[in-house]
Amino acid sequence: LDEDGQRIYIEVKATISADASAPFLISAAELLEAVKHRSRYFIYRVTDVDSAAPPIWRYQDPVGLLLEGRASLRLSDARMVLGESK
């Protein structure tokens, strides 16, 4: 819950790399949750996890960041099905 008592959604992505801008995997389910919850969805990026005090980068509304051009999404195997699922 945030300071106003509203539910927030947090996805933690950790890496041994110190580079917070390094690409990471995000599942379709995680991406759909980010779309659904927008400003209440956060990605916590933990870098340099082998260090004594790994830094944590907090990103709110990753979908908004994409739309503003402040993030990018690489879709190497995106598949879409239109119409009714059988």
Language-model features: locations:
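Domain-level recognition of nuclease-like catalytic cores that cleave nucleotide substrates
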Residues: 35-86
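Conserved catalytic cores of phosphodiester-cleaving nucleases, focusing on short active-site segments
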Residues: 1, 8-16
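Active-site lining segments that contact anionic ligands and/or coordinate catalytic metals
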Residues: 7, 21, 38-41
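Mg2+/Mn2+-dependent nuclease catalytic core
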Residues: 17-36
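Residues immediately flanking
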Residues: 12-14, 28, 48
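Short acidic-glycine loop/turn motifs at beta-strand connectors
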Residues: 2-4, 50
